[in-house]
């Protein structure tokens, strides 16, 4: 008592299924393009970072970068700031959320006093989550 559902379908019958192979091909190409382009859309301020052998941490969706160049000029993202305007710019960028992690990028030639001054300013303003950014190097064996 077997039942055949496609008894009348011969080799010349039309197939009514949607072919999704081209759609999948396009999606994979777009995925590759976005994976290549995403790291390029970060911060363009050139800073000579110190090396580190620690395990890299995962990135948040919208990281906030505070950069200090060798000449002690500061940038939030790609926008230049001064000591006086730094906290105002951070408050505007983070919408006043003090629990936002600030990724601190400093050139390796910046003196310790400048680093501590900037970190103290962040601390006094209520930004307690500060991540220090460094270059990845091969682990010592």
Curated annotation (Swiss-Prot):
Gene induction: Induced 2.1-fold by hydroxyurea.
GO CC annotation terms, alphabetical: cell outer membrane; membrane; plasma membrane; plasma membrane protein complex; transmembrane transporter complex
Superkingdom field: Bacteria
GO molecular function: energy transducer activity; identical protein binding; protein homodimerization activity; transmembrane transporter activity
Gene3D superfamilies: 3.30.420.270
GO biological process: bacteriocin transport; cobalamin transport; intracellular iron ion homeostasis; intracellular monoatomic cation homeostasis; protein stabilization; protein transport
Keywords: Bacteriocin transport, Cell inner membrane, Cell membrane, Membrane, Protein transport, Signal-anchor, Transmembrane, Transmembrane helix, Transport
Membrane association type: Single-pass type II membrane protein
Main function: Involved in the TonB-dependent energy-dependent transport of various receptor-bound substrates.
Subunit field text: The accessory proteins ExbB and ExbD seem to form a complex with TonB.
Similarity annotation: Belongs to the ExbD/TolR family.
Record protein name field: Biopolymer transport protein ExbD
Natural source organism: Escherichia coli (strain K12)
């Amino acid at each position: 008592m077997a039942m055949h559902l496609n008894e009348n379908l011969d080799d010349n019958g039309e197939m009514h299924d949607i072919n999704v192979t081209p759609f999948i091909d396009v999606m994979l190409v777009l995925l590759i393009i976005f994976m290549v382009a995403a790291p390029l859309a970060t911060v363009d301020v050139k800073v000579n970072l110190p090396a580190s052998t620690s395990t890299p941490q995962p990135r948040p969706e919208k990281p906030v970068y505070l950069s200090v160049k060798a000449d002690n000029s500061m940038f939030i993202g790609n926008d230049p700031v001064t000591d006086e305007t730094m906290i105002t710019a951070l408050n505007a960028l983070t919408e006043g959320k003090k629990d936002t992690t600030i990724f601190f990028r400093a050139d390796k030639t910046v003196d310790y006093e400048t680093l501590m001054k900037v970190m103290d300013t962040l601390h006094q303003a209520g930004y307690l989550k500060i991540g220090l950014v460094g270059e990845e190097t091969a682990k010592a064996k």
